[in-house]
Regions:
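Short alpha-helical segments enriched in small residues
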Residues: 1-166
Length: 166
């Protein structure tokens, strides 16, 4: 499934509208999507009313230095893992003061996959505190662009569902 530009725009607009109605702010912590979620959210005029910031933490060093992800989590579980995306959410919340954060770390390809984490494996987390954080793993098919597009769409939809439950 290829998430089109229009689908991404519509999902970003729906989340933006929901954040405005809920009077909530958001921050992003992205690895394999390279800031694409933040880009989609800020494409909309008025997004400064709900987007506080975005951090692209592609390397493990950036995850540690900017988000406070522990070396232990990275060593024991790898960057593409539930503990790491949970720590990325906590770090983004702490760094920005946002009400909600979303984190993404995955293997977009074409290389970099392993038996345990093949290309297309992407971990997501979103939440407003460590206790409320939800983590989900998805396995997407397609080339690098398709994996990243599907990841952005899934993240936008997942966060909207989270906000709807608040």
């Amino acid at each position: 499934m290829l998430a089109s530009d229009q689908e991404l725009e519509e999902a970003g607009n729906r989340l933006g509208e929901r954040l405005l109605r809920a009077v909530r702010t958001i921050a992003t912590a992205e690895s394999c999507t390279g800031g694409w979620v933040a880009k989609v959210l800020t494409d909309r005029a008025g997004s400064s009313g709900y987007v506080l910031g975005g951090l692209v933490t592609y390397s493990n060093e950036a995850k540690q230095g900017l988000l406070g992800v522990s070396r232990k989590s990275l060593d024991e579980h790898g960057a593409v893992s539930e503990p790491v995306v949970r720590e990325m959410v906590a770090g983004a919340l702490a760094a920005t003061g946002a009400d909600i954060a979303v984190a993404i770390s995955g293997v977009a390809g074409p290389g970099g996959g392993s038996e345990d984490k093949p290309v297309g494996t992407v971990w997501f987390a979103w939440g407003s505190s460590p206790a409320s954080t939800v983590a989900v793993v998805k396995h997407f098919e397609g080339n690098r662009d398709q994996v990243r597009r599907q990841s952005v769409l899934f993240a936008l939809q997942g966060v909207k569902g989270f906000v709807d439950e608040l």
